[in-house]
């Protein structure tokens, strides 16, 4: 079996870090969260403030990134999923994520995660998920049935299962 691990909020719990970054970014532009949510995303900010331009959203993402860089300790390594990487090693493990590559590399360095063969950056649309399965089969010279994905996103989990892929659903850590 070959193990494909999602990074953002599966291997590394990032809800608190991500939300803190967006709260900081909102405050920098004299805005605030409209309600309490487990994880603030760009899409949620767009829903709260539809008048924001694409430039404003990019600016906020930049402010969030600066916050994240100096608050990596707010993230937490998922010991169960990290054990999969250390047990099976780089010959049998790869990572995938829809998150910002720079942020992912910072998180991996911060948590000293090195036991993987490759990282595939994905937008995790249904089409791209199908391509990712093919890419991982090429990487490991295996059949789709030999892949096991670790993922927290229910839509991604459902699509992988529709493709007949084994998936270990990982629940996000409750924010204290």
Language-model features: locations:
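Metal-dependent phosphoesterase signature
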Residues: 49-83
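Non-catalytic pre-domain segments flanking phosphatase-related domains
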Residues: 1-5, 27, 55, 146, ...
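Substrate-recognition "cap/lid" segment bordering the active-site pocket of phosphatases
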Residues: 100-148, 154-159
């Amino acid at each position: 079996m070959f193990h494909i691990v999602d990074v953002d909020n599966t291997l590394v719990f990032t809800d608190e870090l991500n939300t803190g970054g967006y709260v900081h970014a909102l405050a920098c532009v004299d805005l605030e969260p409209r309600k309490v949510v487990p994880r603030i995303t760009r899409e949620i900010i767009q829903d709260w403030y539809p008048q924001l331009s694409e430039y404003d959203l990019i600016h906020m993402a930049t402010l969030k990134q600066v916050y994240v860089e100096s608050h990596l300790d707010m993230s937490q390594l998922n010991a169960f999923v990290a054990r999969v990487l250390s047990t099976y090693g780089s010959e049998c493990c790869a990572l995938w994520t829809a998150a910002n590559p720079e942020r992912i590399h910072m998180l991996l360095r911060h948590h000293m995660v090195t036991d993987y063969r490759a990282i595939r950056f994905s937008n995790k649309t249904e089409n791209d998920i199908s391509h990712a399965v093919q890419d991982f089969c090429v990487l490991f010279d295996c059949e789709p049935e030999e892949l096991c994905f670790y993922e927290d996103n229910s839509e991604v989990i459902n699509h992988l299962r529709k493709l007949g892929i084994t998936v270990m659903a990982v629940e996000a850590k409750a924010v204290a």
